Amino acid sequence: MPATFDNLGITFQYPENWQLDEEEMRGGQIAVTVFSPGGAFWSVAVHPASADPARMAQAALDTMRKEYEGLEAEPINETIAGHELIGFNLNFFYLDLTNTAGIRSLRAEGTTYTIFFQAEDHEYGEIGLVFQAMTVSLLRDLGKKK
């Protein structure tokens, strides 16, 4: 049975055995991150509508490039639950393990959202489907709350 996060104007489902962390960032922006028992994580940051989704995705990519030498990034545009997302698929090494991550950003209902997810490649085949389900559950419910 999935757990449900329903706070801060967003709703999404996540596996009940994952750990959830809410944080307030600079400027009153918020982020919610959910961690798997194996260390994979999925995060959503909520920004003002004035934040440009393409710039948010690029800023996240720039931060990752500073952290991980040799990071490979592929631009991606996709539609999920009727929302247009822009971002990047990432591959990089960390502690001698290959990792896959994704950055997605969108503007909806007067707010800009940035979604970030990351897992080691050996678990990504399974965890990637969980990330996808969490993203769909978030985007499906955008605009339903006022």
Regions found by a protein language model. Name each.
Residues P2-Q58, D62:
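Secretory pathway targeting signatures of secreted, lumenal, and periplasmic proteins
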Residues I30, T112-Y113:
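Hydrophobic residues embedded in beta-strands of well-ordered beta-sheets
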Residues L61-G110, Q132:
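Signature of long, low-cysteine stretches enriched in small and polar/charged residues
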Residues T4, N17-E24, R65-T79, D141:
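Short secondary-structure junctions
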Residues P48, F92, Q118-A119:
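Short beta-strand segments enriched in hydrophobic/aromatic residues
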Residues G39-V44, A51-D52, D96-N99, H122-E126:
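Short, surface-exposed beta-strand/loop "edge" segments at domain boundaries and coil↔beta transitions
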Residues S50-T63, G125-S137:
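Surface-exposed flexible segments
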Residues W18, T114-K146:
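Surface-exposed amphipathic alpha-helical segments
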